[in-house]
Amino acid sequence: MAKHSPQELASVLKDGLLSFPVTSFDSQLQFDEENYRKHLAWQASYPVAGLFAAGGTGEGFSLTPAESARVVRAAVEEVGSTVPVLASAGGSTAQAIENAQAAEAAGAEGILLLPPYLTEADQGGLIEHVSAVCSATSLGVIIYNRANAIYKDTTVAALADRHESLIGFKDGVGDLEHDARVYAKLGDRLFYLGGLPTAETFALPLLQLGMSTYSSAMYNFVPQFALDFYQDVRNHDRVAVNKKLNDFVIPYLDIRDRVKGYSVSIVKGGLDAIGRSAGGVRPPLQNLAPQDLADLKALIATVS
């Protein structure tokens, strides 16, 4: 059973850094629960505001529903007493409901609702999709604005009026006008989090649009650096942010951009580099090439 009401959860999440932990796999690319629990325990030993299990960085797109439920349950059992654990819900409406209900049964605190799978929908369809999931669980729900689920400000407002359990808006598009419209219309009714790849890159400007937090993938392998960066952002310390961007984040982006799909692969590469391997990535993603891993390891050494 969730420890926080949806509104309490929003208050906890909006003023701290959010982590999307990788999902550990063994040599056969099967879920390695023991290693995953160790990774989460390490992640939770730092002051992070929330952990999103089986999300994008956690290769949720490659997990079966049963695997996803197992990953979420393991996360809740391992660290749920100290940090809120949220789960992803995606695919068809029926699948998203199944994911949400399984997460609630496992003791998760909230849901990140991913776009419907490969289905184009107008605003009315998106409203019904989100409403169906919100109505099927008592957990707080965060909608993910990206791909084929671009929620207009009026749509978000209608959903917020209909469902008190809708607590957050995550943006993975980066359309500044769109974000400004949503924040201007909804204000403090929701909390807002950045969800672009390597979200640190955009964190300072998006803070001005109400996005007080973001999903940090690099927190997986450089947690203290990620927390320090977040604190610099919240302090509006442009000098410190720009230094960290130039010294680490932008060189990291250069490695990430060498191969499509490296946004996830490079996170597991980072764990390999610090001796905390979480295994490889599942196809169609590719593991980092040896030279890319060597370059990443050298970069991490500059901030460790």
Swiss-Prot record:
One of its GO terms (molecular function) is 5-dehydro-4-deoxyglucarate dehydratase activity. SMART domains: DHDPS. It comes from the Bacteria. The keyword Nucleotidyltransferase does not apply. It is an enzyme of class 4 (lyase). GO terms for biological process: D-glucarate catabolic process. Its EC number is 4.2.1.41. Keywords: Lyase. It catalyses: 5-dehydro-4-deoxy-D-glucarate + H(+) = 2,5-dioxopentanoate + CO2 + H2O. CDD domains: KDGDH. Pathway: Carbohydrate acid metabolism; D-glucarate degradation; 2,5-dioxopentanoate from D-glucarate: step 2/2. NCBIfam families: KdgD (TIGR03249), PRK03620.1 (NF002958). Belongs to the DapA family. This is Probable 5-dehydro-4-deoxyglucarate dehydratase. It comes from Arthrobacter sp. (strain FB24).
